[in-house]
A protein has these predicted regions:
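Conserved AMP-binding A3 loop
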Residues: 71-76, 203-204, 211-235
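AMP-binding/adenylate-forming catalytic core of the ANL superfamily
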Residues: 134, 138-141, 148-153, 295, ...
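Structural core segment of the AMP-binding/adenylate-forming
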Residues: 3-12, 112-115, 119-191
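Conserved AMP-binding/adenylate-forming core of the ANL superfamily
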Residues: 58-115, 132-137, 188-191, 230-231
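Conserved pre-ATP/AMP-binding loop-to-beta segment of ANL
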Residues: 58-60, 170-171, 177, 181-188, ...
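Conserved ATP/PPi-binding loop(s) of AMP-dependent carboxylate-activating enzymes
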Residues: 383-387, 398-431, 467-469, 565
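Conserved AMP-binding/adenylation subdomain of ANL enzymes
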Residues: 234-251, 258-301, 315
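Gly/Ser/Thr-rich phosphate-binding loop
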Residues: 189-193, 273, 291, 299-304, ...
Length: 574
């Protein structure tokens, strides 16, 4: 491994975690922003214009490529283009605080639009391009969005005639527009941009003004709109500096779509607040395409999801040998826990540790992480970010001793915590059941050295014969078996044991489903973990249902298996 602690300690932005944790104060970070002097606040100004008005103006801020396009934009380019889009919105009459949604594939226009929306003081709502009509409707309806930016290809999935608040639709890549309706006026992005001035008076906002509305799916009910404010930039900036360890010369690639919170917090805000060169690759995942991208651009810092790393692992190590990946110096993973097996594989094929970290849509930014300058325990999510207090609490809100599984909670008050669940105060209050603590809904334990270990979602933990079993532990063990590409584990009602463990498994290439293999997998878990943790049922499937951000949807498998309603499926991959 080339990124040993000794090798990186001097070069890392945070050379000593323990010292940083002891001395850190969020107030000190405020000095990094221009509003600390001017009092004028706007995320887009800090992320783009601050650099465009400095020696970084000609630095490449965005490298964009897909099957058809290959483009680059400096900070100055993005300043002027987002100014133009801000003017487009202002001319149409869009005001501060209005919800403006984006429903389009990754493209320069998406990023320019998003920055222009923020410059206008409006609240941006990013949607996954793969959403179908019901998912689009739910989010536009709940948010009372007045404006949507989309493409001709995606427009058929927008029930715009049935959304009374939606008055403007801006189509990207389309000069010929559909007929306006009584309520909706169509605009061409290209036509309006040509008319718009490159000078723009930014709408200065309060740090507590709404900035972005990300919808997140629960196991029940409609998706919830999680509101974050401009003040979140304090956390985006500092976590990108210390966890992503972004440095001046870096080419940074976050593979997440902006429809998912990682794609905004760490695909847009974190890197650009730090003045980094950000790479966006359009199109679908393929190991060859991804490795080619790293090689072509000389990517230094790479952030992706466990599913992607497991897929890369499943195609075998030989593929990596065909590409020059030596530019990589720091790899990170987020979205769901990273199995220890994948960390060891990363050390073998990339000679680098893959750094897992933990946060969620509601926290707005990274909360617990593995840091370049800190010893790693593969399979652990790491230690709390400086300025963050995390704890494992029981049902009554008492802190549990090391090694005991309980509720993962975070002391309220960090800069990027959610400020509201849109139109649902009762749901917002449920996140803070114990005075002063945010309850994540995840179960975890903390070991004697202060490292946190994920055990499962509160509603995923299995009670079998009086024992509590975290599904992630069993899944991680299964993935260690050479035949297994991916695994998901659920609890199934059982009259004798309360619940039994059922595993769903997708095999690697070259393996086929047999009774012998199923028994071998059961024994593999029994011998590797414990008898009570061994699955009593194993179902081998071609694929496992996942969200578009790569999380395996255990609740969907459980619903299919037990014949129950599946709940909201809008975030599920095709």
């Amino acid at each position: 491994v080339t990124d040993t602690i000794a090798a990186v300690k001097e070069k890392a932005n945070m050379p000593d975690y323990e010292q940083a944790y002891k001395e850190f104060n969020w107030k000190d970070v405020e000095k990094s922003f221009s509003w600390h002097e001017t009092g004028k606040v706007n995320m887009a100004h800090e992320a783009i214009d601050r650099h465009a008005n400095s020696w970084r103006k000609n630095k490449v801020a965005l490298y964009y490529s897909d099957q058809q396009r290959d483009e680059k934009y400096t900070f100055r380019d993005l300043k002027l283009l987002s100014n133009q889009f801000g003017n487009v919105l202002r001319t149409i009459g869009i005001e501060k605080g209005e919800r403006v949604f984006l429903f389009m594939p990754r493209s320069p226009e998406l990023y320019i639009s998003l920055l222009g929306i923020l410059k206008n003081g409006s609240i941006v709502g990013p949607l996954f391009e793969a959403f179908m009509e019901q998912a689009v409707r739910d989010r536009l309806e709940n948010s009372d969005a007045t404006t949507l930016i989309t493409t001709k290809e995606l427009l058929p999935r927008v029930p715009y005639k049935e959304l009374p608040h939606l008055n403007q639709i801006i189509l990207v890549g389309e000069e010929e527009l559909p007929d306006n309706t009584e309520d909706v006026t169509f605009y061409s992005y290209e036509t309006e941009m040509k008319k718009a001035s490159r000078d723009f008076e930014i709408e200065w906002v309060d740090r507590e003004d709404g900035m972005i509305l990300h919808y997140t799916s629960g196991s029940t009910g409609k998706p919830k709109g999680i509101l974050h404010v401009h003040n979140a930039m304090i956390q985006h900036y500092q976590t990108a500096k210390w966890v992503l360890d972004l440095q001046e010369e870096d080419i940074y690639w976050c593979t997440a779509d902006p429809g998912w919170v990682t794609g905004t917090s760490y695909g847009i805000f974190g890197p650009w607040l730090n003045g980094a060169s950000n790479l966006i690759r359009g199109g679908r995942f393929s190991p060859e395409d991804w490795y080619k991208t790293i090689e072509k651009y000389g990517v230094n810092v790479w952030l992706s999801a466990p599913t992607a790393f497991r897929r890369l692992m499943a195609v075998g190590d030989n593929v990596t040998k065909e590409y020059d990946l030596r530019s990589l110096r720091h790899i990170l993973s987020v979205g769901e826990p990273l199995n220890a097996e994948v960390v060891h594989w990363g050390m073998k094929v990339y000679q680098l540790r893959i750094h897992d970290h933990w946060w969620m849509t509601e926290t707005g930014g990274i909360i617990i992480a593995n840091y370049r300058s800190m010893e790693m325990k593969p399979g652990s999510m790491g230690k709390p970010f400086p300025g963050i207090e995390a704890a494992i609490l029981d049902e009554q809100g008492n802190e549990l001793p090391p090694g005991k599984m309980g509720k993962l909670c975070v002391k309220a008050g960090w800069p990027s915590v959610l400020r509201a669940v849109w139109k649902n105060e009762a749901r917002f209050n449920q996140y803070f059941p114990v005075d002063g603590w945010f309850e994540s809904g995840d179960l975890a334990l903390k070991d004697k050295d202060g490292y946190f270990w994920f055990e499962g979602r509160d509603d995923d933990v299995i009670q079998t014969s009086g024992e509590r079993v975290g599904p992630f532990e069993v899944e991680s063990k299964l993935v260690e078996h050479p035949a297994v590409a991916e695994a998901a584990v659920i609890g199934k009602p059982d009259p004798e044991r309360g619940e039994i463990i059922k595993a769903f498994v997708a095999l690697r290439d070259g393996y086929t489903k047999t009774d012998e293999l199923q028994e071998e997998l059961r024994l593999f878990v029994k011998q590797g973990l414990a008898a009570h943790a061994a699955p009593r049922e194993i179902e081998i499937r071609e694929f496992l249902p996942k969200t578009r951000s790569g999380k395996i949807m255990r609740r969907v498998l459980k619903a299919w298996d037990l014949g129950l309603p599946t709940g909201d499926l809008s975030t599920m991959e095709e």
